[in-house]
Amino acid sequence: MCAERLGQFVTLALVFATLDPAQGTDSTNPPEGPQDRSSQQKGRLSLQNTAEIQHCLVNAGDVGCGVFECFENNSCEIQGLHGICMTFLHNAGKFDAQGKSFIKDALRCKAHALRHKFGCISRKCPAIREMVFQLQRECYLKHDLCSAAQENVGVIVEMIHFKDLLLHEPYVDLVNLLLTCGEDVKEAVTRSVQAQCEQSWGGLCSILSFCTSNIQRPPTAAPEHQPLADRAQLSRPHHRDTDHHLTANRGAKGERGSKSHPNAHARGRTGGQSAQGPSGSSEWEDEQSEYSDIRR
């Protein structure tokens, strides 16, 4: 129930977030105000923004956060790249040698890739956003984000702020990658985000965490039960065969009636008690009892 409602809420939010404001306007009545014209261009980067970003990228170097600042305040609303860069640089002194090397190499990788790929991509906002996030993921994985996070868990947790996850998609992408870096990193990041969420939203975070735990909870039926059931089904034909032999033997002995010796009945009971053993041994004992009755 929680998962269904949460899914409906997220779907509705995404629909409103991606809805084109210009959809449904009549082509014979173009918008007159500058706000209407800008709303029509939400789906693609304006020519002015494109020229400004390209000029900014040419002047920015690979070192520092200048390249990422070029993507702030544009019509595609790509926010957060510059903030992540500044956060890494401000906390670089808290990392060990491996972490510092990761920060330097990953930021340089992202800056170099953005500068060379931006001129080759479409001006459509979804294409630009996908290009930005794909390059970010590639650089994080190429320079081993998980190793740096595992050796610097405390610093990584300090860098993550709940409000950034609500406002900037690059932060969400970074946290999603961190959640794949082993149980220690995953637990620390989850605990930190949960605590910050409860400070901001209160009891709503507890409801969301309850829904998430229900979604991720494994099935109650243990997998070991199935092989036991299969073994029980396989053993039933054997028991039916054994019962059939015992019934036939008892019928044959009943027909002989008074001709049978009391010792023969004792041997028959002994054979019945050992029916759980191999069927060949039971049949051999029955044949011996019949031969004994004939001799008598």
From Swiss-Prot:
Please describe what this protein does: Has an anti-hypocalcemic action on calcium and phosphate homeostasis.
Signal among keywords? yes
Record field: compositional bias (Low complexity): 272-282
Q: Which residues form a coiled coil?
A: none
Keywords, A to Z, come to:
Disulfide bond, Glycoprotein, Hormone, Secreted, Signal
What's the protein here called?
A: Stanniocalcin-2
Q: What is the lineage of its organism?
A: Eukaryota, Metazoa, Chordata, Craniata, Vertebrata
Cell division keyword on record: no
Q: Which organism is it from?
A: Mus musculus
Position of the signal peptide: 1-24
For this entry, list what GO says about its biological process: calcium ion homeostasis; cellular response to hypoxia; decidualization; embryo implantation; endoplasmic reticulum unfolded protein response; intracellular calcium ion homeostasis; negative regulation of gene expression; negative regulation of multicellular organism growth
Instruction: Please note every region of biased composition (Polar residues).
Output: 24-44
